[in-house]
Amino acid sequence: MILLNSILVAFDFSDTSISALNYGRNLAHAFGGRLHVLNIADVISTSAAQFYPEGPGDPEAKATALALSQLKTILAAENAPEARPAVRVAPDPAVAIVDFAKEIHADLIVIGTHGRTGVSRILMGSVAEHVVRTAPCPVLVVRPAEHERSEEHTSELQSQR
């Protein structure tokens, strides 16, 4: 029998991660598991936190607090108030996701993929692919809707001209 006591959703505020959240929420509900939702704040983007109107302070702490607040808002809007939100600052999202999965003893990781191909995949890499290769548990990869993939593919072709 499959037990999903602890489910981790990797969340990057994209439409695909909303879909991943819905999968994770439904699985947690069906299996009676605990739902964890993790956002990895980019180290570079935390430097922009120094410009927040709250004044001076630790930019990393401000960026983390802002991401956590936004994450809680989305969880409430997506009918996942029981989810346990978390934000980590890390230079490598894939490593941070796998480390967090180990920390919470995740039975499943749910992650969206942006479906990049070609040059953009080579340049940006694939967080989902790295998580699949290194995760301590099974990984459910949620693909973007067909229209999202076709829009991204079109913009990629246009950028190659």
Predicted regions and their residues:
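Short, hinge-like loop/turn segments at secondary-structure boundaries
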Residues: 52-56, 101-104, 127-128, 155
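A short acidic, glycine-rich active-site loop
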Residues: 55-69
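Structural beta-alpha unit
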Residues: 1-2, 75-109, 147-149
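Single conserved hydrophobic/aromatic residue that forms the stacking wall/gate
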Residues: 152-161
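Glycine-rich, Arg-bearing micro-motifs that act as flexible, cationic patches
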Residues: 108-130, 144, 148-149
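Small/aliphatic-rich secondary-structure junction motif
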Residues: 2-54, 61, 147, 155
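General small-molecule cofactor/ligand-binding pocket signal
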Residues: 36-38, 84-88, 140
